[in-house]
């Protein structure tokens, strides 16, 4: 099973005898399995450490240390992180990933995690990779300054991108739904390659060069 890693696909294998291969694809359709547009953005924030980062900021800024009574809070944040990452991996795969990612099982008065073949850290890293290719996109294309909004979004509306893909690329709904954000960006750049304008980095470079020349002229005029 070959994964197209350039567009975000991942292939993982169960190395045990009789084990199978799994293909994970962070498509627009897979993103909708995660939840509502708001939940998709919340999931992205969670798997990139937003909850833990907030706890650390509070402790370091207000308390100046990490008190013992906060350990349960870190444990809950870690459990939420793992559970969310498991959700992302399963959303991106058509097969049941329980043998690989494990599962949460009720036991007496608590819920415990029964591990699969993959280490927890690998589950987290792969979930981050999938969300980056599924929501943000990692295509190496020029981002023009005029297209930058600088605004944070609270929603990721996958269906809007599916509709855009159908309109721009003449795809049917099923084909468009299987695109990842990275693939969508690459197709868009290929169809509209001659957009004029500057990226943020290009604009800043030109501005810095202009200001440097201006300063040199003024310094020379004062001599």
Task: Label every PLM stretch briefly.
Residues 1-62, 76, 84-92, 99-198:
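An amphipathic, hydrophobic-aromatic interaction surface with interspersed Lys/Arg
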Residues 64-80:
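Intrinsically disordered, low-complexity acidic Ser/Thr-rich regulatory segments
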Residues 201-223:
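Long, intrinsically disordered, low-complexity Ser/Thr/Pro-rich regulatory/activation regions
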